[in-house]
């Protein structure tokens, strides 16, 4: 149900080189429970090619006897109009238990027809962002990427207006190097001049442990997933 708010405060200031934001809210106490307190601070420093930032949150949940503080430092570096590198370092502290994570991404668009990107993600088994954020799972290391080629220079006699060729991959383990299912796929998207589209996709998944379904339940912490492959054909009119 809903809870009354004792107070809420928001402050935002944006300048040419620095952005500052603060949010605070406190829930009212009820007859049989105490309200939660939420606080968030965002700082971002901008320059010509580099942006660096900080995000901090703190949540006090007295009913659960739980205090959660999260610190995140992030950056985005653009040496030119074609290349972008970004990343973040994260730390959560839940009742004095620390968790850590990081992500790094790279994107290169040398021309209008080609793009290539990669990402590296690491989250240990203690990091927890759930009090004032979201993390789909922890305890994993993943390398993921996409390479895409777009062809729009088709003959005038062609029935197609453009074609996209895409390679996707994701390699995963947990933080103890137990292999999790990894995936590879190739996709062809063909756009016709009558604005219908045809999509052809083939994919392959390796075998490995899956602990997302079980949520690491003590009696059955993971499922052994078999390898698999498949095809997909989709036509959109």
Task: Label each region the model flagged.
Residues 13-15, 22-26, 56, 89, ...:
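Glycine-rich, histidine-containing beta strand-loop boundary motifs that form or position
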Residues 33, 64-66, 131-132:
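Short, solvent-exposed loop/turn segments at secondary-structure boundaries
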Residues 20, 38-93, 153-166, 232-237:
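Surface-exposed extracellular loop regions of Gram-negative outer-membrane beta-barrel proteins
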Residues 16-19, 50, 83, 110, ...:
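Secondary-structure transition into beta-strands, especially the periplasmic turns and strand N-termini
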Residues 4, 88-237:
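Exposed, low-structure sequence patches enriched in small/polar residues
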Residues 9-12, 40-44, 72-76, 84-88, ...:
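Short, well-ordered alpha-helical packing segments
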Residues 1-46, 152-156:
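Outer-membrane beta-barrel initiation region
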Residues 1-3, 29, 61-64, 68, ...:
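Beta-stranded membrane pore/translocator domains
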């Amino acid at each position: 149900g809903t809870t009354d708010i004792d107070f809420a405060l928001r402050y935002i200031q944006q300048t040419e080189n620095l952005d500052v934001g603060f949010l605070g809210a406190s829930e009212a106490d009820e007859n049989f429970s105490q309200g939660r307190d939420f606080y968030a601070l965002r700082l971002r420093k901008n320059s010509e090619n580099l942006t660096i930032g900080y995000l901090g949150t703190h949540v006090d949940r007295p009913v659960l006897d739980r205090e959660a503080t999260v610190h995140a430092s992030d950056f985005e570096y653009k040496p030119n109009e074609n290349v972008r590198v970004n990343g973040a370092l994260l730390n959560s502290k839940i009742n004095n238990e620390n968790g850590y994570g990081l992500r790094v991404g790279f994107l290169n668009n040398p021309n209008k027809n080609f793009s290539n990107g990669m990402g590296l993600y690491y989250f240990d088994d203690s990091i927890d962002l759930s009090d004032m954020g979201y993390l789909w799972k922890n305890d994993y290391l993943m390398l993921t990427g996409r390479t895409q080629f777009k062809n729009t220079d088709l003959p005038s006699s062609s029935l197609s207006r453009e074609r996209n060729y895409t390679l996707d991959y994701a390699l995963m383990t947990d933080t103890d190097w137990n292999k999790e299912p990894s995936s590879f796929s190739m996709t062809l998207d063909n756009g016709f001049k009558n604005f219908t589209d045809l999509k052809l996709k083939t994919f392959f998944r390796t075998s490995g442990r899956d602990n997302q379904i079980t949520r690491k339940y003590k009696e059955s912490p993971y499922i052994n997933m078999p390898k698999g492959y498949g095809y997909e054909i989709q036509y959109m009119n």
